[in-house]
Amino acid sequence: MELQANLENVLQKVNNFINIDAKRQIYAAHFDNLKNTIFNELRKNEVLAYLFNGFQLGGSYGDNVKVTVPNEYDLVFNIKFPEQPLIIVTADHELPGNVFLDFTRVIHKIAKEKQHEKILQHLKQWLDDENYLKVEKFQWFLRSCFIDVLTKMNFKITFKGRTSSLRYSREGPAHTIKVTESLNFDYSVDFVPGILLNANQCVTSNIVGQWEAIPKPTPTNNHLYKSFRASFYRQEQKIIKNQQQLKNVYRMMKKFRDSKTNMLKMKSYFIKTLFLWKSSRENVSYWSKPLTEIIIDMFKDMEKSLREEKLPFYWDRKLNLYDNYQPRLMREMLNCVESARETLEKAAKELTLPLQKRVFCIFCKLKI
């Protein structure tokens, strides 16, 4: 291994190494075909066709920070209820970052309108006695729609003469479809429903534009549960978009996470949250600095959050994203991050061949 002139050169090589463009097109073409087929079939359901209001690519692909084989996709499909501005949104004070959706005014309005007769019948089945939308009732309707579609497709899809098997599962708020063609080609798609709401209905933050309420279930799948997670993906995209080195460092932090077994509980959204907070504190010009300076800063921020066992949800500080993690896990992640940060700082001061190898090992599963 040739010794590089400085740490910046090493980090540039790492940044180039984690680019996945080579395989992106193969997966993307198959995924586009699956996505279009599934949505076209779902819209044959009269009720879902009425509620469906487009979709957006979410997760790492939507943010353009995917670093591994492109085999996982997140799709948020928007649900827009009739008279949606009449939905009364209130904060769930027992679960920060979550909201309740009260359909009382919606029911009163559409009950008088014949064109809403069918959707009204279904909507009443999804509400509790106080007209709050219930997470599992609504999710079971969507589940039935996906199962009907996949059954009609015989749980298979053919693209360019090659047939793949399809398997359905519920993963958190997502309706997940696993696609398998061979041992060397498989991927999954998380279809996540997002109930569209307006900026003036947001009770957790001051925002511009629409946002979504995500039907994220409780661990016990309580059928009476009526609390939805507030999601601001559009606003988050704007914050991290066109920020020079931001996405390069973001990808590298994810690659660090992926290469360390004791970091796998550091969710992608947690890493994203660190960048959202950093963007709120720094001037736009900050992201034009060298990779070396920014990545050491981000390791320090991650280290600080783990040491304090606190990472506030960007849109509601009362929610600590680390809340469900045990102290032992936090210490394991802290030790890993601290070690990486120390290596980077040493390499920034004086790069040697052993240090260079250790820097590569921070981001890649290499044996020295």
UniProtKB/Swiss-Prot annotation:
Documented EC number(s): 2.7.7.-
Keyword terms, alphabetized: Antiviral defense, ATP-binding, GTP-binding, Immunity, Innate immunity, Magnesium, Manganese, Metal-binding, Nucleotide-binding, Nucleotidyltransferase, RNA-binding, Transferase
Pfam families: Mab-21, Mab-21_C
InterPro entries in the record: Mab-21-like_nuc_Trfase, Mab-21_HhH/H2TH-like, MAB21L/cGLR
PANTHER family assigned to the protein according to its UniProt record, in alphabetical order: CELL FATE DETERMINING PROTEIN MAB21-RELATED (PTHR10656), CYCLIC GMP-AMP SYNTHASE-LIKE PROTEIN-RELATED (PTHR10656:SF42)
Residues the record lists as binding ATP: 60, 72-74, 233-236, 254, 268-272
Coiled-coil zones: none
Function (record text): Nucleotidyltransferase that catalyzes the formation of cyclic GMP-AMP (3',2'-cGAMP) from ATP and GTP and plays a key role in innate immunity. Synthesizes 3',2'-cGAMP in a two-step reaction through production of the linear intermediate pppA(2'-5')pG. Acts as a key sensor of double-stranded RNA (dsRNA), the presence of dsRNA in the cytoplasm being a danger signal that triggers the immune responses.
Binding site residues for GTP: 190, 229-236
The family this protein is said to belong to: Belongs to the mab-21 family.
Reactions that this protein is recorded to catalyse: GTP + ATP = 3',2'-cGAMP + 2 diphosphate; GTP + ATP = pppA(2'-5')pG + diphosphate; pppA(2'-5')pG = 3',2'-cGAMP + diphosphate
Regulation of catalytic or functional activity: The enzyme activity is specifically activated by double-stranded RNA (dsRNA).
Keyword ATP-binding: yes
Gene3D superfamilies linked to this entry: 1.10.1410.40, 3.30.460.90
Cofactor requirements of the protein: Mg(2+); Mn(2+)
The protein, known as: Cyclic GMP-AMP synthase-like receptor
Native source organism of the sequence: Lucilia cuprina
Record-level Gene Ontology MF annotations: 3',2'-cyclic GMP-AMP synthase activity; ATP binding; double-stranded RNA binding; GTP binding; metal ion binding
Superkingdom of the organism of origin: Eukaryota
Residues that bind Mg(2+): 72, 74, 190
GO BP term, example: defense response to virus
